[in-house]
Amino acid sequence: MANKPSPGELKNGLSEMQFYVTQHHGTEPPFTGRLLHNKKNGVYHCLVCDAPLFNSQTKYDSGCGWPSFYEPVSDEAIRYLTDNSHGMQRIEIRCGNCDAHLGHVFPDGPQPTGERYCVNSASLSFTDEQNGEQIKG
């Protein structure tokens, strides 16, 4: 995958939770993510490689405890993998650019797509379209 930092660079540049989530397919505890309640307009990026993933206009409150979106910025932004871990059948979502784990997608979202991209805050950064401020999850 393109633009992925070395394991050493990642270990030094990410918090313990960010590293666990993005590199070891972890999940942050629900309702704890820094970007869960973010209501600003802008773009959510991959924390590892800064690739754009989701527009704020597609974010909604699903009540699940993680930031939820109904569609990515492009078809290429997200990579999909079958995940049969923990006795469940799910679709894992990863960054299409660097392969960082983001979360999962479920078929219970709102229209127009009917999908819920359930994403760990720890795998995202957000860039505010008004002032360019970047917030890391």
From Swiss-Prot:
It is an enzyme of class 1 (oxidoreductase). This is Peptide methionine sulfoxide reductase MsrB. The active site is at C118. The keyword Zinc applies. Binds 1 zinc ion per subunit. The zinc ion is important for the structural integrity of the protein. Zn(2+) binds at C46, C49, C95, C98. It comes from Klebsiella pneumoniae (strain 342). The gene is msrB. The lineage of its organism: Bacteria, Pseudomonadati, Pseudomonadota, Gammaproteobacteria, Enterobacterales. It catalyses: L-methionyl-[protein] + [thioredoxin]-disulfide + H2O = L-methionyl-(R)-S-oxide-[protein] + [thioredoxin]-dithiol.
